Regions:
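Conserved SDR Rossmann-fold cofactor-binding beta-strand/turn motif
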Residues: 49-50, 54
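N-terminal Rossmann-like NAD(P)+-binding domain of SDR-like oxidoreductases, especially those catalyzing
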Residues: 1-18
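Active-site Tyr-X1-5-Lys
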Residues: 2, 18-46
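Substrate-positioning beta->alpha
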Residues: 25-29, 58-62, 74-97, 102-103
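Mid/C-terminal beta-alpha module of Rossmann-like enzyme folds, strongest
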Residues: 90-152, 165, 181, 185-188, ...
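Short aromatic-enriched loop/helix-cap "lid" or pocket-rim segments at secondary-structure transitions
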Residues: 2-6, 57-62, 117-120
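Alpha-helical membrane-targeting segments
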Residues: 60-83, 125-161
Length: 194
């Protein structure tokens, strides 16, 4: 993760080293779909790689963090991140379904924000967690029982992962309708205690 290009395009391989079994499975599923994509050109296979999906009803780590009153941050790190509203992602899926176009496509808006600034815009206080030595943040998070900041995503909260969604936007005529301001307002108005 630390060596990602500034904008990750569809040619970049997915990385699963050191991640959870679920994320490793996701990478393997995409690899299998990719094999079929090239082995069987008659099949119409469209693979969508979204950025962080957030919004009402979304129950993933990043959505949980944005919804907290106080969220942990790794001291000295605030990577750039992208967010797409769940309704915009649903629109992207419908577009991909309605237009048979084979290939791999990143789905992301053309804006991004630093993680700690996103927390601030969502009305979250920040709990700084020391990032070195590497075992220390894991011990602190385990002690505080902060499941929303899982240790296997530690690198994700250190280094930027910004994907290039221009190919999908161009091919499918996709433009997200919900700006970051609207996404963050939802989290600011719907806080959950730690």
């Amino acid at each position: 993760v630390a060596y990602n290009p500034a904008l990750i395009d569809e040619e970049a391989p997915l990385k699963s080293a050191g991640l959870s079994a679920d994320l490793i499975d996701s990478v393997e599923l995409e690899n299998l779909a990719n094999i079929y994509l090239w082995r069987y050109p008659d099949l119409n296979i469209t693979i969508l790689r979204p950025c962080n999906i957030v919004g009402p009803g979304v129950r993933n780590s990043i959505s949980t963090l944005l919804g907290m009153e106080r969220a942990p941050v790794l001291a000295g790190f605030s990577p750039m991140m992208q967010f797409i509203h769940i309704d915009d992602m649903a629109d992207a899926i419908v577009l991909a379904y309605n237009k048979p176009q084979r290939g791999i496509f990143n789905v992301a808006p053309q804006d991004w924000v630093a993680y700690q600034h996103a927390l601030k815009l969502c009305g979250c206080g920040r709990i700084p967690v020391p990032s070195i030595p590497p075992i220390l943040p894991r011990m602190i998070l385990r002690t505080l029982n902060l499941r929303s900041f899982p240790s296997y995503l530690m690198h994700f909260f250190k280094y930027p992962v910004v994907i290039d969604g221009r190919a999908f936007a161009r091919e499918f005529g996709f433009t997200p309708r919900r700006p970051l301001k609207e996404i963050f307002r939802f989290y600011r108005e719907n806080k959950k205690p730690v």
